[in-house]
């Protein structure tokens, strides 16, 4: 999670210091009251795997005790899960008779959630709440099965900041309820694109709940439903087909935002690479037996932070724009989010990779601040910000996204290397706080309980911190140490020693109220399709970390007879654990290192664990591996800080009335704008009568009807919600008229939901709509 994810906590700590002990006692009492029970998710079907090391990567007694604790089954945990008879696992003949390819299904579904009154997840900037929508967010699912239909794998790329453990556990639970053991922990990967402009509020660990300003069950349930629907669509639409792979570089769209950390890696290692970022894009092309397009998965290392932390519109950022362009091209005649072709631009080892290619500059003087501490002579680190290539963040998003789309399109068109061979999968739950890491045949070290360093609070050049923390800090500060110690208690000597040279700002692994602040139990997972291996990474690997893991996994496969494997780093998968740097980068303690929560040997631990998964697949011993300790599922979480209130229209007006109409005439390239009497858009998550907040419609004289030309998923539209006092609000719809717009008569429509509550009665959500007067678009 890039950039200043903890400014909310900084404000929280300062507030507590000022208000002194009385407020502290009250808050702690509240946290204890809100503490809920813990449920562990039991086996969801199939084999779930842990690994052993040679020498072993051992799990300590704490993990063993946790895994044997008597707790409730998750089969009864979710009251919202649809309980249906499991789908029988049967070969899908005669579809596959005399066929040697794969059975392929693709699906896409909306998972947008709230677009107002919720914090945007990624920057952690206090007050960066959603206030409208630029594009919809989607879950894109791809199912690949062997010819008899029984052995299959699922890859899902989701337009969210990252996959939370709670989200994955709930999805797996509902998949089990519907499909039995067909879709399981080991063969389903959930990956977040890492957009920093999606809603937060879907986490269960306290650090992320604070950054989200509470848990939003509405958004959580909408995300779960969207992910499941995309998998259902892919499952229903499976057909015989072929998969091809292609690779190629994408130039001019990324820089390393921590080059001084990268330089800590051995010169001999750096000399093997021409760049301090991974420029290679890997593309999977999926077609049916007639050669008709089905879908694309692309993996490329880039942070979706072209939209900066001043943005308040929900959107999928640069990678989402790339998906938008390719899907619109392949699904001609369909509105965005519709049509059979599905294109996912998935995340990879993007930890230190920025799309803001103009680099860091002091915004007050214009001079470069590309230094070890990312700080400016005047104003310090808060003035050091990197910018993208465009005139504004919208333009930069399009430029970077279009470049990725164009390269993926080229690689897709020229893909000729077919992916063949059996499918396999391996998964393990691991206690990452207690892994023995073998440095060589005789010496070992261990991972640590989670902790965040001082440079974490500094943020990055993509989104700086609110207080004057600096990257590259290897010493603490007495002022902040005192605040932390008074409110949270002192970190133990053990955790301080384990994390050196990181100066600990927050000893999250030793904080457990109202729930643990960070996860202990983490997923590691590999899926293979013939000669392709997809490693599901539970966080953000830096460039060199990804390179080392790829090489190690590839070498492990090769040592057991699986030569020439292509290993993909798939980022932000299954559970979020911040960053993973190399041991050498960790010593520099910039943002990424300070956010490597399990200590300096985190990468080495992951390399051991993923090598053992690769070995199990290569030697066909996956079934012999244990599943590992089970993660918790917390039932009660802190509610959102922003309450729901009744919507009100101005006197003499009603919801959807036009307050400011569009002008009578516009030229292409101009912006048509209409302002309506609005209501809180978060109501639409509860009552989904309408599937869009807006439409732009063109009058067709031949049919004497209005035809929709774009909606709120279209890049050229923007929906802004302006919150007033006492339930009053306005909604502004903008249509940035593209050069491709046909001349003619148009109108703009607004669709919303208002919250109404009569005295002594429960609140109800009512739908409404508004329509602007017609206006003309001309090309001259």
UniProtKB/Swiss-Prot annotation:
* Notes on activation and inhibition: Inhibited by dithiothreitol (DTT) and 2-mercaptoethanol. Activity is mildly stimulated by Ca(2+) and Mg(2+), but is not inhibited by EDTA. Activity is inhibited by millimolar levels of Fe(2+), Zn(2+) and Cu(2+). Inhibited by cholesterol.
Output the lineage of the source organism: Eukaryota, Metazoa, Chordata, Craniata, Vertebrata
Q: Which residues bind Zn(2+) per the record?
A: 194, 303, 540, 579
Where exactly are the transmembrane stretches of this chain?
13-33
> What is this protein for, i.e. what is its function?
Plasma membrane ceramidase that hydrolyzes sphingolipid ceramides into sphingosine and free fatty acids at neutral pH. Ceramides, sphingosine, and its phosphorylated form sphingosine-1-phosphate are bioactive lipids that mediate cellular signaling pathways regulating several biological processes including cell proliferation, apoptosis and differentiation. Also catalyzes the reverse reaction allowing the synthesis of ceramides from fatty acids and sphingosine.
Q: Key word Disulfide bond present in the record?
A: yes
Per UniProt, the cofactor note for this protein states: Binds 1 zinc ion per subunit.
Which BP terms does GO give this entry?
apoptotic process; cellular response to cytokine stimulus; ceramide biosynthetic process; ceramide catabolic process; ceramide metabolic process; lipid digestion; long-chain fatty acid biosynthetic process; negative regulation of apoptotic signaling pathway
EC supergroup of this enzyme:
hydrolase
Post-translational note: Proteolytic cleavage of the N-terminus removes the signal-anchor and produces a soluble form of the protein. N-glycosylated. Required for enzyme activity.
Q: Quote the catalytic activity from the record.
A: an N-acylsphing-4-enine + H2O = sphing-4-enine + a fatty acid; N-dodecanoylsphing-4-enine + H2O = dodecanoate + sphing-4-enine; N-hexadecanoylsphing-4-enine + H2O = sphing-4-enine + hexadecanoate; N-octanoylsphing-4-enine + H2O = octanoate + sphing-4-enine
Q: Which UniProt keywords apply?
A: Apoptosis, Calcium, Cell membrane, Disulfide bond, Glycoprotein, Golgi apparatus, Hydrolase, Lipid metabolism, Membrane, Metal-binding, Mitochondrion, Phosphoprotein, Secreted, Signal-anchor, Sphingolipid metabolism, Transmembrane, Transmembrane helix, Ubl conjugation, Zinc
Origin species, per record, is Homo sapiens
State the PANTHER family in the record. Answer: CERAMIDASE, NEUTRAL CERAMIDASE
Task: List, alphabetically, the InterPro entries matched.
Answer: Ceramidase_alk, NCDase_C_sf, NEUT/ALK_ceramidase_C, NEUT/ALK_ceramidase_N
Annotated active site residues, numbered on this chain, are: 354 (nucleophile)
Pfam families in UniProt: Ceramidase_alk, Ceramidse_alk_C
Q: Where is the composition biased (Low complexity)?
A: 57-85
Q: Where is this region: Disordered?
A: 47-90
| Activity's dependence on pH | Optimum pH is 7.5-9.5 for N-hexadecanoylsphing-4-enine. Optimum pH is 7.5 for D-erythro-C12-NBD-ceramide. Optimum pH is 7.5 for N-octanoylsphing-4-enine.
- The protein's name is Neutral ceramidase
User: Cytoplasmic face: residue ranges?
Assistant: 1-12
Enumerate the Lumenal topological stretches: 34-780
Q: Which residues are glycosylated?
A: 62, 67-68, 70, 73-74, 76, 78-80, 82, 84, 98, 151, 217, 308, 440, 468, 564, 730, 779
Q: Which GO terms describe its molecular function?
A: calcium ion binding; N-acylsphingosine amidohydrolase activity; zinc ion binding
